[in-house]
A protein has these predicted regions:
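Active-site region of glycoside hydrolase catalytic domains
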Residues: 1-200
């Protein structure tokens, strides 16, 4: 989160980004950060779940991180540290290995999950909002996406949607608690089937 928000709010990347991802950082032109950190009217946050990881030399870079890194392949291929004989996927993995960013995902047992396997943990939304509130001088916040994929069923003409109902109820409760703690949340947009028409 700080990878994206710190440049917007403070005009610089977190130091940890340069420590771990220096070889895949985008080229930063002279006035880029000044443009990126121009004043914004509001901050939109998409939130669905949390990810749990632990350190370990035997761990692997998560698929999510690899997908993000692949977007920077053009810049990575220009690096002299990477062999032209390796496949792109191997290049990325080797690069991450060189930077000592080994970790592995932790799949907790006996936790509620959505139909696509994401953990349901609304408390993480409260932590995100309060942490950002205490770290940055933020504009008003809008939750621009929040929701869950649920394998619901129609029973006697009625959609059995208890899990999704509970998901929204609990996450809205976290937003309410964040507001009580001083976070300036102005709006909340539930993710719905209509959102799929953006890309599906």
């Amino acid at each position: 989160t700080h990878w994206f928000i710190k440049p917007i709010m403070e005009g610089k990347y977190p130091e940890s980004v340069f420590q771990h991802f220096i070889n895949i950082m985008p080229t930063i032109a002279e006035n880029d950060m000044a443009i990126i950190s121009e004043k914004i009217d509001f901050l939109g946050l998409n939130f669905y779940s949390r990810s749990m990881i632990e350190s370990g030399r035997q761990g692997k870079v998560s698929d999510t991180i690899l997908r993000k890194i692949k977007r920077a392949e053009v810049r990575i291929q220009e690096s002299n540290d990477i062999s032209a004989d390796d496949s792109k996927g191997d290049q990325l993995q080797k690069l991450m290995n060189q930077k000592n960013t080994h970790y592995k995902s932790v799949d907790l047992e006996e936790v509620e999950r959505t139909h696509i396997g994401w953990e349901v943990y609304p408390e993480a939304l409260l932590k995100l909002l309060t942490d950002l509130h205490h770290t940055y001088n933020l504009p008003p916040i809008y939750i621009t996406e929040n929701g869950a994929a649920v394998d619901d069923h129609v029973i006697d003409g009625v959609v059995d949607d208890e899990q999704r109902y509970r998901y929204y109820q609990n996450h809205l409760s976290m937003v309410d608690q964040a507001i009580e703690k001083g976070v300036d949340v102005r709006g909340y947009f539930a993710w719905s089937l209509m959102d799929n028409f953006e890309w599906a």
